[in-house]
Amino acid sequence: MDRVNLRMLAAIALSSAVCGLAQPAENAENKVDARHVIGLDNVRRNSTGLLTIRDGGLQFQGGKTTVKLLTASIDDIAIGTETTQAGGKAGTVAKTAAIAAPYDSGAALSILLRTNVDVLTVSNRDSSGGLHYAILAVAKGQGEQQRSQLITAGAHVAAPSGQDLKEGKSAAAEMPTAISTKLSASAIQIEPMGAGDVWIPAEFRAAMYEFLVMRVRQSGKFQQVFRSGDRAAANVHDLLTLHTTVEKFKQGSQMQREITTVFGSTKVGVDASVTDRDGHVLLAQRVQGKVLFFGENLGVTNDLAKHIAKRLKQE
């Protein structure tokens, strides 16, 4: 494919991006273009829509689906950043062309197809006390504005932890000794990922939790999968609990991965354990997730959740 055609594809992709997350919507209701990463019930992952703060809640409307989180249910809001693909379907077509193109021109097009976005992570509770994280990508600079508006509307935020943590690997810790037994319980409760003494962005921890809930449910291993804090779990006599703690974290670069195919990988290692009601450790394992080539950095959490869900199903 020649350079002229590559330039045309890039122009189409970037034009689409300008109409999408690259620019906030301008109207009286302060609607903002957003992409749903994960966490909203009945909303497809990576679907796009309009984000509005109105009538005491955060509303996401995509196509015929509208979901609203009441500000009173929100207990924390975090802002992160991500580098993602611009241009929607046009961007996908252009990126495919870049792969087939000569190395130098394909790499240049990959750079043009990158755009930085804010990642809005909204922690909230359902009517049963279950913990949810809604993760949304918005145009750069819109995340803090949405956070401020939600706080003004009555949303709660947690105080800063004050921890001075660094990306890397935690101090070596021994895995707990697990009882050799099959996991035959009818239900399991998923707890949010603990950071330990490793720095990891809030959106990674939140996405890990949401993907774990989704993947463990899809595995069919347990009749019931409860979210952290769900009061209904208290009535299950054989309830198990899944704990995860970050053991190491390396945030790579999506653009570097796609240009070089060698460098820029994102990796997360966690210590995963399953305990019974008496606190006995039934399963303990160190698991690693990674994104080596295509995909946003947050994709590492989905990979990690797949590995853990598969391990649980084998027991």
Report residues per predicted region:
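Extracytoplasmic/secreted envelope proteins and their assembly/folding machinery
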Residues: D55, T71, G143-R147, I151, ...
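A structural "domain/chain start" motif
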Residues: A22-T48, P160-Q218, Q251, A284-G289, ...
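Acidic, Ser/Thr- and proline-rich intrinsically disordered linker/docking segments
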Residues: A78-G168
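Surface-exposed short loop/turn segments
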Residues: T81-V117, S228-D278, G295
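Phosphoinositide-binding peripheral membrane targeting modules
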Residues: R54-T96
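Bacterial N-terminal signal peptides
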Residues: L9-V18
